[in-house]
Design a protein with these regions (language model features):
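Conserved active-site segment immediately N-terminal to the catalytic lysine
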Residues: 196-207, 217
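Conserved PLP-binding catalytic core of the aspartate aminotransferase-like
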Residues: 307-337
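Active-site phosphate-binding strand-loop segment of PLP-dependent enzymes
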Residues: 138-190, 201
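Active-site C-terminal subdomain of aminotransferase-like
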Residues: 37, 207-297
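N-terminal "arm"/small-domain region of PLP-dependent enzymes with the aminotransferase-like
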Residues: 6, 10-57
Length: 384
């Protein structure tokens, strides 16, 4: 037997120097849940259009037609029924929550709160002095509650995919409810199937399934949601212009935003929507995520050191997978080794505090790369 070589042993087990064999590595190492992977073709298309597009006025035809492409493309992708409209504004989803407290919630909202993001809209509604305290239904992290029709509630706030825990929920109108159904689909939109008849407002930001950058919000609004916006705007309720959804509506109808948007973000978004629509629409894009999810969860279930965090298989998200590790393995070390090898952002949601990795499986992420990631994790655990 060869004499014990301390240096060799150290280089084999220190996370900083563990080198994953290149044939195991995914072709693209981006697995972050937002901002997330942007496809090379989107960048190429942006670069090609740059000389006549970037650095030009958002009030002129070139940019406005790109915004029009986004609005029409989303209507097609989500098969929006007659009368639904696509609104967009600056500030991302977090800004939209505040806008919703002014111009979507009339008196009282009900929130399903089952993680960091869904709880944030509930807090925004609770803080707003001009509406009643919301009704909040919570459930354990790793599960989701169910909305129930409630007297006095005029808006039901659902979350398609709770990005902090990796739980997805079906979008259905609560039985017997008369209020609007507003869905935070920031991480779910484009990666999960949805029926537009089941919502009045399906809102998101483009840095997740839509492979663009942050800072913008988009909302698919039913005629009932538009009517609510118009009546609250006419009600005399004081509203800062930035959160005024009537101003947003008027600008969106002209393919503009109230103030200057990031033009690159809109271009990248338009490319992604086009890619989805040209390849078969939402069944194509959500199908890619579903295939990736099947790979990730079946790997974890077969593993003797990893398990899906979400117990109910139906609740396990197709777009953001959360995987727990057994106590003898430190997930932060795995994430660190992966990062040192160019495979990034698999860290769990910071406030969840579990021995876990979180893997984005948005439509842009190739399923073969998810399979490679699983192989890399197996290799790291075997070599630590
Ligand atoms: C990322 C995310 C948000 C926050 O989006 P911002 O654009 O950063 O405000 C909100 N809700 C969900 C479900 C998310 O995944």
């Amino acid at each position: 037997m060869a004499p014990f070589d301390f240096r060799k042993n150290k280089s084999m087990s220190s996370p900083d120097t563990l080198q994953i064999p290149t044939d195991l590595l995914p072709r693209d190492g981006r697995f972050g849940s937002g901002p997330s992977k942007i496809r090379g073709e989107q960048i190429t298309a942006l670069v090609a259009d740059a000389p006549t597009y970037l650095g030009t006025s958002h009030r002129q035809a070139t940019v406005r037609s790109k915004v029009g492409e986004v609005r029409d493309g989303l209507s097609a992708l989500f098969n929006l029924p007659e009368g639904y409209e696509v609104l967009l504004g600056n500030g991302g989803t977090t800004c939209f929550w505040d806008a919703a407290t002014f111009h979507l919630i009339a008196e009282q909202s009900q929130h399903l709160s089952f993680g960091e993001f869904s709880s944030k809209f509930a807090s925004a509604a609770k803080e707003a002095p001009h509406i009643k305290d919301p009704s909040i239904i919570t459930s354990e992290v790793g599960t989701h509650p169910t909305a129930v029709a409630e007297e006095g509630v005029d808006l039901y706030a659902l979350t398609h995919n709770e990005t902090s825990t990796g739980v997805m929920m079906p979008i259905v109108r609560p039985a017997g409810a008369t209020g609007l159904v507003a869905v935070d689909a920031t991480s779910g939109a484009g990666g999960l199937m949805v029926d537009a008849n089941e919502f009045d407002c399906y809102y998101f930001a483009p840095q997740k399934s839509f492979s663009s950058d942050g800072g913008l919000w988009l909302a698919l609004c039913s005629p009932a949601a538009i009517e609510r916006i118009e009546s609250l705007a006419a009600s005399g309720r004081w509203t800062p212009a930035f959160f005024d959804l009537k101003i947003t509506l008027d600008n969106s109808r002209l393919n503009q935003t109230y103030n200057t948007p990031a033009l690159a973000t809109i271009h990248l978004l338009a490319s992604q929507i086009k890619w989805m629509n040209e390849n078969g629409g939402l069944s194509f894009s959500s199908g890619r995520s579903r295939t990736s999810a099947e790979i990730l969860y079946s790997w974890a279930e077969a593993s003797d050191f990893a398990t899906p965090f979400v117990t109910n298989p139906a609740d396990r998200s197709n777009v953001v997978g959360t995987i727990d590790f057994s106590d003898d393995i430190d997930a932060t070390v795995i994430a660190k080794v992966l990062r040192a090898n160019g495979v990034v952002d698999t860290d769990p949601y910071r406030k969840l505090g579990r021995n876990q990795l979180r893997v984005a499986m948005f439509p842009s992420i190739d399923s073969e790369d998810v399979a490679s990631l699983c192989a890399c994790i197996n290799w790291i655990v075997g070599n630590l």
